């Protein structure tokens, strides 16, 4: 797969404790992205954040939170991202949890598999 020039960065904000059954929402998203042959995806774990509920989630040594902020970043062409957004929305519906989905244009400068 080749990816260069103008592409879309899709960000999905969720919580570490958000699951569908025993699988974390972020893992459901990553697996779905791989099944749809998305160019790439990364899960980032935040140290502090809040969302629509305004509840602050934090990682402190004294009180280790089990619900830290999670951001899934996905990059691919505009068409593939637009086709993938309903998949993410369905995952959120199944989890019965809230979240946030954003997109922005990015310029891919380098994207090559291992040799």
Annotate the PLM regions.
Residues 1-115:
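Positively charged, small/polar-rich N-terminal and surface patches that mediate targeting and assembly
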């Amino acid at each position: 797969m080749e990816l260069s020039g103008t592409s879309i960065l899709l960000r999905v904000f969720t919580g570490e404790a958000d699951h569908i059954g025993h699988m974390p929402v972020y893992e459901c998203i990553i697996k779905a992205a791989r099944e749809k042959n998305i160019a790439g995806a990364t899960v980032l774990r935040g140290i502090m954040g809040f969302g629509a509920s305004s509840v602050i989630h934090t990682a402190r040594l004294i009180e280790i939170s089990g619900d830290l902020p999670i951001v899934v970043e996905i990059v691919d062409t505009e068409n593939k991202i637009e086709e993938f957004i309903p998949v993410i929305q369905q995952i959120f519906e199944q989890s019965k949890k809230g979240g946030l989905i954003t997109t922005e244009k990015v310029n891919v400068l380098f994207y090559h598999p291992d040799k």
